[in-house]
C-alpha cells in the first residue's frame, strides 16, 4: 500500500513537472514572439496579428493583391503586415513609389531574399542577388542583350522570324478552338533562348515543351499557398511533404537543362567570337581563374535561368491577356486591325519602325499591360538601413512590397480604372505616355529586359492581329479570371483564330 502511494505521488510529480515544463516552453516561445514582433515607434499601422503566424491566414493567396487593396482603404498608402516571421510594409501611390525608388533608392535597392529563392539559388543569379554580385551579373546581362540583339536589327529580325513560326503554328489550328498558352510561351521563349543559348526550339520539341510546362508550374507554385507557407515557415515546411516540394524538384530539372547546354558550349566555344550570353559568361570566367568575382559556375546557371524565366513568363502572359481581351472586345480588335491595314497592309512584315505610326495599337498594348497587371506587387525589396519614410520608421531588413495594382487601378489617375479602355493612353489621337504606368518598375532595379519586352509585344501582337481575327468558341463565354502565381496570368482559356488573309 505504501509502495503504491509512493508510486502515485511520484507519477503525479512527474506529470506536474511535465506540464510545468510544457507551460514554461510555451510561455518562453510566446515571449520570444512578442519580443520579435515589437515594432519601433512610428512603425506603419496594419491589421491585428496572430502569434507566430502573423497575418498569414488573413490573406487569400489566390488573390493577394485584392486583399491588400482592402487594407489600403483601411490603413492608408503605407501599412504593415507580418507573414510568418517576416515583417512586411506595403507602399501604394505614385509619389511614395517615386520617392522610394529615386530619392531614397540606396535604402531600397536590395532584393528581399525569400526562403524559397534562397533554397533554389542561394544568393546567386540576377534577380535576387545584391551588392557586388548583382552589379557584375547585371553588367554582363546588359552587355549580352546589347551585343546579341537588343536595339539591333538582328533582334528585330529574330522576332519577325519567330512571328512567322507562331503564325503558321496557329494557322494549323484551322480556326478551331485551341489554347494559345504553349504556342505563345514557346515563341517568346525562343527570343531569349537565341540571346542566352544561341538557338531556338521547335514547337514540336517534346523535351522543350515539357520544360516550358515545368517552368509554368514552378512559377505558379512559387506564388501559391504552398509556396507562401514555405516562405513563412521554412524551418517546418522543408520537412513536410506537399506541393511546395515540387518547386525544388522542378528547379533541379531546369538547372539540369541549362547545365547540359553549358557543357555543350564549353566544348566548342571560341573566346574571340562569342555567340550568346553563355559564351560571354565563359569569357568572364576565363579572365578570373581564381574566382575573385561572381563569375563562377553557380552564377552562370542561376543568371542564365533568371534570364530564361524573366524573358519568357512575363511577356508570354501579357500576350495571353492580349488575345483574351481582343476576343472579349471585338470592336477594339477591329480598330487595331483597321490601323494595321492602313499602316502596314496585309502582306508586309510588321517592323518596329511602324510603332510611331500606330498610336492606337500601341495604346491597346499598354492597356493590356495595365489591366493584365501581371506583376501586381512588383518584386519585393529590402530596407538596407533604418529609414524614415513618409513619417514612418522602417527598420533594416523589412520586406517592401510596392502596390502596382493600386497604382494601375487608381481612380485619380485613370478615367475608367476597372474597364479596358485604350483611350487611357491616347490624347488627340496620339499615343500618350503615363507617369502612373510602371509595369517594368523604376529605378536601379527596374526590369533590364524592358526594351526587349516592348519590341516583342509590339511585333508579336501586331502580326497576330494582322493575320487573324480572334473569337470565342461558338456558344462559349470567355472569362477574364486570373491565376495567381509569381505573376498574374489569365486562367486557361480557348479561342478561335480565324485567318484574315
UniProtKB/Swiss-Prot annotation:
Q: What class of enzyme is it?
A: oxidoreductase
Q: Which domain of life is it from?
A: Eukaryota
The Gene Ontology CC terms held by the record are:
endoplasmic reticulum membrane
Q: Does the keyword Cell division apply?
A: no
Which keywords annotate this record? Endoplasmic reticulum, Heme, Iron, Membrane, Metal-binding, Microsome, Monooxygenase, Oxidoreductase
Entry protein name: Cytochrome P450 2J5
What the record says about family reads: Belongs to the cytochrome P450 family.
Looking at the Swiss-Prot or TrEMBL record, what is one Pfam family this protein matches? p450
> Which Enzyme Commission number(s) are listed?
1.14.14.1
Subcellular location, record wording: Endoplasmic reticulum membrane; Microsome membrane
Reaction(s) catalysed by this chain's protein: an organic molecule + reduced [NADPH--hemoprotein reductase] + O2 = an alcohol + oxidized [NADPH--hemoprotein reductase] + H2O + H(+)
One GO biological process term is: regulation of systemic arterial blood pressure by hormone
Record keywords: Endoplasmic reticulum included? Answer: yes
InterPro entries in the record, alphabetically? Cyt_P450, Cyt_P450_CS, Cyt_P450_E_grp-I, Cyt_P450_E_grp-I_CYP2J-like, Cyt_P450_sf, Cytochrome_P450_fam2
- MF annotations from Gene Ontology: heme binding; iron ion binding; oxidoreductase activity, acting on paired donors, with incorporation or reduction of molecular oxygen, reduced flavin or flavoprotein as one donor, and incorporation of one atom of oxygen
Where along this sequence does the record place binding of heme? 447
Taxonomic lineage from the root: Eukaryota, Metazoa, Chordata, Craniata, Vertebrata
UniProt topology in membrane: Peripheral membrane protein
Signal sequence, start to end:
none
Q: What is its main location?
A: endoplasmic reticulum
Q: Which cofactor does it need?
A: heme
Amino acid at each position: 500500500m505504501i509502495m503504491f502511494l509512493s508510486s502515485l505521488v511520484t507519477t503525479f510529480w512527474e506529470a506536474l513537472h511535465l506540464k510545468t515544463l510544457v507551460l514554461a516552453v510555451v510561455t518562453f516561445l510566446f515571449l520570444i514572439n512578442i519580443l520579435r514582433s515589437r515594432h519601433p515607434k512610428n512603425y506603419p499601422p496594419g491589421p491585428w496579428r496572430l502569434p507566430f503566424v502573423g497575418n498569414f491566414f488573413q490573406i487569400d493567396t489566390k488573390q493577394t493583391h485584392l486583399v491588400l487593396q482592402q487594407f489600403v482603404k483601411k490603413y492608408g498608402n503605407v501599412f504593415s503586415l507580418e507573414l510568418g516571421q517576416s515583417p512586411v510594409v506595403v507602399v501604394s501611390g505614385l509619389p511614395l513609389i517615386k520617392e522610394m525608388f529615386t530619392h531614397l533608392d540606396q535604402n531600397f535597392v536590395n532584393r528581399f531574399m525569400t526562403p524559397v529563392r534562397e533554397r533554389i539559388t542561394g544568393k546567386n543569379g540576377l534577380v535576387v542577388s545584391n551588392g557586388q554580385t548583382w552589379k557584375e551579373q547585371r553588367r554582363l546581362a546588359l552587355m549580352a542583350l546589347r551585343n546579341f540583339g537588343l536595339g539591333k536589327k538582328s533582334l528585330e529580325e529574330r522576332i519577325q522570324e519567330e512571328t512567322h513560326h507562331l503564325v503558321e503554328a496557329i494557322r494549323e489550328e484551322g480556326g478551331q478552338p485551341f489554347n494559345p498558352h504553349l504556342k505563345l510561351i514557346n515563341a517568346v521563349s525562343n527570343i531569349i533562348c537565341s540571346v542566352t543559348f544561341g538557338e531556338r526550339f521547335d514547337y514540336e520539341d517534346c523535351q522543350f515543351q515539357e520544360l516550358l510546362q515545368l517552368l509554368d508550374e514552378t512559377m505558379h507554385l512559387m506564388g501559391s499557398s504552398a509556396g507562401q507557407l514555405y516562405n513563412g515557415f521554412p524551418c517546418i515546411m522543408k520537412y513536410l511533404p506537399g506541393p511546395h516540394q515540387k518547386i525544388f524538384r522542378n528547379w533541379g530539372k531546369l538547372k539540369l537543362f541549362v547545365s547540359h547546354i553549358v557543357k555543350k558550349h564549353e566544348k566548342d566555344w571560341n573566346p574571340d567570337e562569342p555567340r550568346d550570353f553563355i559564351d560571354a559568361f565563359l569569357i568572364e570566367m576565363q579572365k578570373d581563374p581564381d574566382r575573385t568575382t561572381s563569375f563562377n559556375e553557380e552564377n552562370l546557371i542561376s543568371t542564365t535561368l533568371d534570364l530564361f524565366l524573366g524573358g519568357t513568363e512575363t511577356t508570354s502572359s501579357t500576350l495571353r491577356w492580349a488575345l483574351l481581351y481582343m476576343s472579349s472586345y471585338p470592336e477594339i480588335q477591329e480598330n487595331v486591325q483597321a490601323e494595321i491595314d492602313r499602316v502596314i497592309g496585309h502582306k508586309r512584315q510588321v517592323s518596329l519602325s511602324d510603332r510611331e505610326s500606330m498610336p492606337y495599337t500601341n495604346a491597346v498594348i499598354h492597356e493590356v499591360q495595365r489591366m493584365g497587371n501581371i506583376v501586381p506587387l512588383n518584386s519585393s525589396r529590402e530596407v538596407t538601413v533604418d529609414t524614415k519614410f513618409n513619417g514612418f520608421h522602417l527598420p533594416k531588413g523589412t520586406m517592401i512590397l510596392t502596390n502596382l495594382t493600386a497604382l494601375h487601378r487608381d481612380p485619380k489617375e485613370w478615367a475608367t480604372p476597372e474597364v479596358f479602355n485604350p483611350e487611357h493612353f491616347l490624347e488627340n489621337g496620339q499615343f500618350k505616355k503615363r507617369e502612373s504606368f510602371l509595369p517594368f518598375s523604376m529605378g536601379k532595379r527596374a526590369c533590364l529586359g524592358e526594351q526587349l519586352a516592348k519590341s516583342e509585344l509590339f511585333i508579336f501582337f501586331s502580326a497576330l492581329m494582322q493575320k487573324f481575327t480572334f473569337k470565342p468558341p461558338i456558344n462559349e463565354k470567355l472569362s477574364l479570371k486570373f491565376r495567381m502565381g509569381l505573376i498574374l496570368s489569365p486562367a486557361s482559356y480557348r479561342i478561335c483564330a480565324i485567318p484574315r488573309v
